[in-house]
């Protein structure tokens, strides 16, 4: 039997593509290498599944063509996604601009999509490893598990390399290369950064709301704000994830990357407050004094780095040393030496070059009937539901084009 479309990968983009194509009365085969559908969806949003975000802009996406994704998200965006899930009987709720299934369970999303796939009689094969795909004349041939399937169209929805234990092992890049597509440089993104410094390890476990500024060869390349987590290996947390793409890109280009943290961004009058406290609390040691401002581990790290005795009475501290401490509170330097791997990354940066993909249909410019969607493309979003929105959008866009045939 020849299918109208074969979809390789049953993550968010693959399941959306299958439902959309089947909704256009196309005969669909969905192939998944894992034992269950949507495993990566189950891990998103700490198991709550952050579907999308109220704020949506072109700058929420990265890649060699940052503007590639946004016009398609305008075509099928947040409101369309909400309506789609409501049509399947799943309510969506909003919390501070972040959208989740009303159950706050990622399993609800996977179950809802799976139920619709079955209702539409989509053929599904799990634990199916696609080893080869080719096109001869007007037909695609997809091989794996000692079987071969035929179709008029082929959608690659395999994901990238992030979280390989959930199914994304990079196999889609080989399939795309076999069709002569270029793969841009790929690397982990939305991931923790590794840092050096003997005093930094002493801060492990600390969480601190900070302004984050990233410099590459002394040039500012990114800024963020939020709760930074200090770890044994370096720094993590949402603001670090948000800037990780730019920091890692610079590291891979052999640039010197440093992060500067304003550890007290809420204190615009830090110097004035310090002067007031000095008058009323001059009986404290330097360490005790600044523990009224910051986590004690951070205070200790700052004093150690500046070689200031933490037991020294604050009344005896010189104006020069006081200014040095205040400066470091507002410009705490973290030298970035590396980054965590794909096993800890939320998304893959880079992928199939969007220069070879038709914007608006996601069909290959090199081969008619071949489509590439989701994380496999050189498109990665920031934290907050942007990558799932892109996955659903891209699956819908590609399958809708096939549906019009």
What are these regions (language model features)?
Residues 22-46:
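Glycine-rich FAD pyrophosphate-binding loop
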């Amino acid at each position: 039997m020849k299918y109208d479309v074969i979809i390789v990968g049953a993550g968010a983009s693959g399941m959306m593509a299958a439902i959309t194509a089947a909704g256009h009365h196309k005969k669909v085969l969905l192939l998944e290498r894992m034992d269950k559908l949507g495993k990566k969806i189950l891990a998103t949003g700490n198991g709550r599944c952050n579907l999308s975000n109220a704020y949506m802009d072109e700058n929420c996406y990265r890649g060699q063509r940052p503007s590639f994704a946004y016009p398609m998200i305008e075509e099928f965006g947040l409101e369309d996604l909400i309506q789609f899930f409501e049509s399947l009987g799943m309510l969506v709720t909003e919390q501070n601009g972040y959208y989740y299934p009303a159950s706050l369970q990622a399993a609800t999303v996977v179950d809802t999509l799976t139920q619709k796939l079955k209702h539409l009689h989509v053929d599904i094969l799990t634990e199916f490893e696609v080893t080869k795909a080719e096109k001869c004349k007007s037909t695609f041939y997809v091989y794996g598990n000692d079987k071969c399937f035929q179709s008029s169209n082929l959608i690659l929805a395999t994901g990238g390399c992030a979280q390989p234990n959930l199914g994304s092992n990079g196999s889609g890049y080989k399939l795309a290369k076999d069709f002569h597509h270029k793969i841009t440089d790929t690397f982990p993104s939305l991931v923790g950064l590794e840092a050096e410094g003997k005093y930094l390890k002493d801060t492990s476990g600390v969480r601190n709301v900070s302004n984050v500024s990233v410099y590459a060869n002394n040039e500012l390349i990114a800024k963020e704000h939020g709760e930074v987590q200090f770890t044994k290996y370096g720094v993590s947390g949402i603001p670090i994830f948000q800037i990780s793409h730019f920091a890692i890109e610079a590291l891979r280009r052999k640039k010197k990357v440093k992060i500067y943290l304003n550890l007290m961004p809420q204190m615009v009058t830090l110097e004035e407050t310090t002067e007031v406290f000095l008058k009323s609390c001059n009986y404290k040691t330097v360490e005790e004094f600044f523990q009224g401002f910051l986590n004690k581990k951070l205070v200790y790290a700052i004093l150690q780095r500046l070689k200031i005795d933490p037991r020294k009475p604050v009344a005896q501290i010189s104006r020069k040393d006081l200014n040095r401490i205040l400066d470091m509170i507002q410009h705490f330097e973290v030298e970035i030496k590396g980054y965590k791997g794909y096993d800890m990354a939320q998304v893959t940066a880079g992928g199939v070059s969007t220069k070879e993909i038709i914007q608006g249909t996601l069909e290959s410019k090199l081969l008619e009937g071949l489509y590439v969607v989701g994380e496999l493309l050189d498109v990665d979003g920031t934290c907050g539901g942007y990558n799932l929105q892109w996955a659903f959008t891209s699956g819908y866009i590609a399958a809708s084009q096939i549906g019009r045939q």
